[in-house]
Amino acid sequence: MLTSQKVSRVLLHSSFLKTPVSTQSRSFVFTTIATTLFGSVLWSKNNVLASKMENHELHYNDPNDKYRKLLEKKRGPAFTRAAAEYPGQVRLYNYEKFLMFLGSSIGSFFHPEENKYIVALGESTAIEPVLKRLQHAMLSDPTGRQILRERPRITSTSLDLDYLRSLPDNTIGKSYITWLDREGVSPDTRVPVRYIDNEELAYIFQRYRECHDFYHAITGLPIIIEGEISVKVLEYMNIGIPMSGLGALFAPLRLKPSQRKRLREIYYPWAIKNGLYSKPLINVYWEKILDKDINEFRREMGIEQPPDLRDLRKEYFAKKRREKELKAAAAAATVTQRQRQQQRATATAANATSASSANVKPSNTAGAM
């Protein structure tokens, strides 16, 4: 009996011990693995922190360090200009550009014949958004892209002027050289661009400047003040150069009433219409169409030739001379008529005096008798 009880106790005790031991051993394994992994992470972080402490790098980041570096970057040396992007470029600060605009505006208004004022005004008003728009227009056109790629220049060297003189009269090249000879100008009179910052934008403005005489040639407008204003209006409506718009707005203020009347009634309407509805002139590769018929070119571009300004001026001055002659003749006739009236009055007075003298003599004789 005792033996069976002991055996049962032993079996019970052994079964009781086996389960907890097995459970404890599995828990220990998992705990050991987790502790090892977590400890390795902590140990590696501790190693990193210890290394930073040893190298004096812990908590060394200055919160003002970025701000200090930004100030040093912005400050830089005082009055130091960036390097030029193209030959002859002159870098200007914004206040210098404003002063140049102010001075050239006043100079252009009172002395439009001085090219230096016109040049400075053109570049000081050729702001980047305007030139970027022209750049986009050229890049959107196959011919415009070719011009930007090849960078042609219009000078007496690049153009064979003798060849242009040999072309037929109805060609663009012959019309161009005829206009140059008549007005006494040369392709070399266009001053290089100096004050525009971007190199490609500077070339675009240079291209516009050198093509100006072609606009005169295809329209037939001379370089006298009315012709220049008319071409400026055409340029502004077609290309959008700010200086052209300023010239169209303020230049007529110094003209005579007869000149303003011609612009208002004839050339402003013509320039606005043709500038708006014609194709972009900035995309014309003039050097490659010099032998093209000028009338065909006008039709393709949608440009009408305006009335001849020189003929209108001749007619006006001839009319003024006739009016002056008529006034002089009328004044002379009036003087002659007055002289005749005065002569008649003098003759009448003389006759009256002689008649009265004749009447007085007989009465005196009778009294004496």
From Swiss-Prot:
It is found in: Mitochondrion inner membrane. It catalyses: a 4-hydroxy-3-methoxy-5-(all-trans-polyprenyl)benzoate + H(+) = a 2-methoxy-6-(all-trans-polyprenyl)phenol + CO2. Residues 329-369 are annotated as: Disordered. It is an enzyme of class 4 (lyase). GO terms for biological process: ubiquinone biosynthetic process. Zn(2+) binds at H212, D213, H216, E228. Its cofactor is Zn(2+). Pathway: Cofactor biosynthesis; ubiquinone biosynthesis. Its EC number is 4.1.1.130. Residues 1-35 form a transit peptide. Keywords: Lyase, Membrane, Metal-binding, Mitochondrion, Mitochondrion inner membrane, Transit peptide, Ubiquinone biosynthesis, Zinc. Residues 329-360 have a biased composition (Low complexity). It is a peripheral membrane protein. GO terms for cellular component: extrinsic component of mitochondrial inner membrane. Component of a multi-subunit COQ enzyme complex, composed of at least COQ3, COQ4, COQ5, COQ6, COQ7 and COQ9. Lyase that catalyzes the C1-decarboxylation of 4-hydroxy-3-methoxy-5-(all-trans-polyprenyl)benzoic acid into 2-methoxy-6-(all-trans-polyprenyl)phenol during ubiquinone biosynthesis. PANTHER family: UBIQUINONE BIOSYNTHESIS PROTEIN, UBIQUINONE BIOSYNTHESIS PROTEIN COQ4 HOMOLOG, MITOCHONDRIAL. Belongs to the COQ4 family. This is Ubiquinone biosynthesis protein COQ4, mitochondrial. The gene is COQ4.
